[in-house]
């Protein structure tokens, strides 16, 4: 039987990339679970090991970092003293990682976002700054990128390749987020810019006999289409890596529409295990069946690789390895080999590897796997009904909005679902029907959570007492988080409902519910504050933030002062006033 995906990678995205013990843990998981690649994802990872030497006085014939350093150390010390020695230390570290991975048949890839560079180049190349804005169209950048990747593969010849995202504003400079108004930028189209940048990367990578993958990580449908146009002009050996959902890792979104639409190029599809937008594992959100379906469609679209991200660049010191969401990584590894593997088998493998069972017997695996499925199988439903509303993203990377305007900016602008599913354009409009649906979602989600949590009172034989105690603690924390999120989103949607004209009966009922919702927010903020005296991982207190809840309440109270004026205006529906 053939494997689901030929290429199965674990991706590290946080500063754990530079933590040897964490990288070894990832390599151990890859080996144990039959994966075959490690992706080290830091936006500046190439710039952390390459100066490049050419711009500091290195000779053309220099072929490694020490030869280059011998001709550049004085200039480096003058212009960038803190960066003088760091690159050759990090180069040795990464060479060791690549060598260790090769021993077990695992490829190592870099992933980044371009353009990225050290600020010293703005001093060395003053033409790059024009009227206070950085210019992405200056020819220097394309020369710089080509030199950077030439030196990279001289330093790390064992590196399998590079995955890059040229279409996001999260790089230091991109045509996508360009604020320069010079003549060069006026003439430069996104398609031309992407083509020139990708070409500058591809030439040295291909010359080294290695591979380049380009991501379609973009923030809008228009940007995705502009980048897709550049794909058509890329050399045939460049592949495309696509998030499984468009824009970002939102499990409520449809499949990324570019999957299967990249011509004959190799394709990878990317998944997030930790849960940047679905609770960080502080609220477990296990996505086994969602992923099984998405992977099946990806296989039908001739996708050959799958990537599973374990952490996030903006949340250092946290990882899927620290939470129940590690189940997602096991799911990715196992489904990536065989889409028919049963859900209970994935849970059992997670429990065995986490040493949660008294003994690794077929009987205990079966009993504990089935129990874990009943405990966690609907966990995504509970998160979906609190952090989302009618499938729209009402969370700021799993944190609660800080105010009224912030919430709708997140849901309808920054993370717009309507951009990818036009039927959702009015999903959050302040109507009675939408309000009822959103409030019901909160109630049903919390009920799902409580039914699942009841399994903790009926543990299976073979489960260690310590494992059960840990799960009980996790669920107590999750309960607080979901209750806080449900209260916050109830208050937000009631505030929006009251912010426009409504019939008198609906307004009176809405006002009563809004007042209760604000009281709930206050009570939960007090509970969160008391909980601060406990001792858990820092990310727990980031999500259970009393200060954040109180900020939201204060904003909504200020907003409520305008409700009386709104109530005096005629209702669009012509209702009673």
Q: What residues fall within each predicted segment?
A:
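Conserved, well-structured beta-alpha core segment at the onset of a catalytic domain
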Residues: 1-11, 357-360, 364
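Aromatic-lined carbohydrate-binding surfaces of glycoside hydrolases
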Residues: 4-251, 278, 310-337, 379, ...
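Generic recognition of stable, solvent-exposed alpha-helical segments in well-folded globular domains
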Residues: 25, 92, 96, 147, ...
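Active-site clefts of carbohydrate-active enzymes
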Residues: 119-120, 170-177, 262-293, 308-310
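Noncatalytic carbohydrate-binding groove/subsite architecture in carbohydrate-active enzymes
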Residues: 224-239, 247-271, 277-279, 292-296, ...
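P-loop NTPase catalytic cores that bind/hydrolyze ATP
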Residues: 298-307, 377-381
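C-terminal non-catalytic alpha-helical accessory regions
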Residues: 310-546, 571-572
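A eukaryotic intrinsically disordered, low-complexity regulatory tract that is acidic and Ser/Pro-rich
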Residues: 539-577
């Amino acid at each position: 039987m053939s494997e689901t995906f030929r290429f199965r990678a674990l991706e590290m995205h946080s500063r754990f990339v530079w933590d040897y013990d964490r990288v070894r843990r990832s390599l151990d998981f890859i080996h144990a679970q039959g994966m075959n690649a490690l992706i080290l994802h830091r936006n500046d990872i190439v710039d952390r090991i390459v100066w490049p030497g050419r711009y500091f006085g290195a000779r053309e014939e220099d072929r490694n970092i020490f030869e280059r350093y011998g001709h550049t150390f004085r200039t480096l010390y003058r212009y960038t003293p803190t960066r003088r020695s760091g690159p050759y230390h990090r180069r040795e570290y990464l060479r060791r990682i690549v060598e260790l991975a090769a021993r077990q048949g695992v490829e190592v890839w870099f992933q980044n976002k371009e353009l990225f560079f050290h600020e010293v180049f703005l001093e060395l190349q003053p033409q790059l700054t024009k009227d206070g804005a950085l210019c992405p169209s200056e020819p220097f950048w394309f020369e710089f990128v080509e030199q950077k990747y030439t030196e990279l593969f001289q330093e790390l010849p064992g590196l399998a390749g590079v995955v890059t995202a040229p279409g996001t504003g999260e790089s230091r400079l991109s045509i996508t987020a360009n604020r320069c108004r010079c003549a060069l930028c006026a003439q430069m189209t996104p398609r031309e810019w992407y083509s020139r940048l990708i070409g500058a990367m591809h030439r040295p990578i291909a010359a080294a006999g290695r591979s380049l993958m380009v991501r379609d990580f973009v923030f809008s449908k228009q940007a995705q289409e502009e980048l897709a146009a550049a794909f058509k002009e890329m050399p045939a050996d460049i592949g495309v890596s696509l998030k499984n959902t468009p824009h970002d890792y939102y499990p409520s979104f449809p499949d990324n529409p570019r999957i299967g639409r990249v011509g004959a190029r190799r394709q990878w599809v990317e998944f997030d295990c930790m849960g940047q937008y679905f609770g960080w594992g502080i609220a477990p959100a296990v996505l086994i069946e969602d992923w099984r379906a998405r992977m099946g469609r990806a296989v039908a679209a001739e996708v050959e690789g799958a990537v599973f991200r374990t952490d996030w660049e903006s949340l250092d010191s946290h990882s899927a390895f620290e939470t129940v969401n590690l189940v997602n990584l096991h799911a990715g590894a196992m489904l990536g080999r065989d889409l028919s593997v049963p859900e209970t088998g994935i849970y059992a493998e997670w429990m065995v590897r986490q040493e949660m069972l008294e003994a690794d017997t077929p009987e205990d695996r079966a009993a504990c796997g089935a129990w874990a499925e009943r405990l966690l199988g609907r966990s995504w439903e509970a998160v979906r009904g609190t952090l989302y509303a009618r499938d729209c993203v009402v969370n700021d990377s799993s944190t609660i909005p800080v105010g009224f305007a912030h919430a709708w900016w997140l849901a309808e602008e920054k993370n717009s679902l309507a951009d990818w599913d036009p039927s959702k354009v009015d999903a959050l409009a302040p109507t009675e029907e939408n309000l009822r649906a959103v409030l019901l979602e909160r109630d049903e989600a919390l009920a799902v959570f409580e039914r699942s949590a009841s399994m903790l009172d009926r543990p299976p034989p073979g489960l260690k007492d310590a494992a059960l105690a840990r799960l009980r603690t996790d669920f107590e924390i999750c309960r607080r988080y979901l209750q806080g999120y449900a209260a916050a989103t109830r208050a937000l949607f009631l505030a929006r409902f009251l912010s426009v004209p409504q019939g008198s009966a609906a307004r009176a009922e809405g006002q009563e519910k809004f007042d209760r919702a604000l009281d709930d927010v206050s009570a939960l903020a007090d509970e969160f504050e008391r909980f601060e005296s406990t001792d858990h991982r820092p990310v727990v207190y980031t999500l259970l933030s009393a200060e954040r809840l109180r900020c939201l309440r204060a904003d909504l109270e200020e907003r409520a002062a305008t409700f009386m004026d709104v109530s005096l205006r005629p209702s669009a529906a012509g209702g009673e006033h």
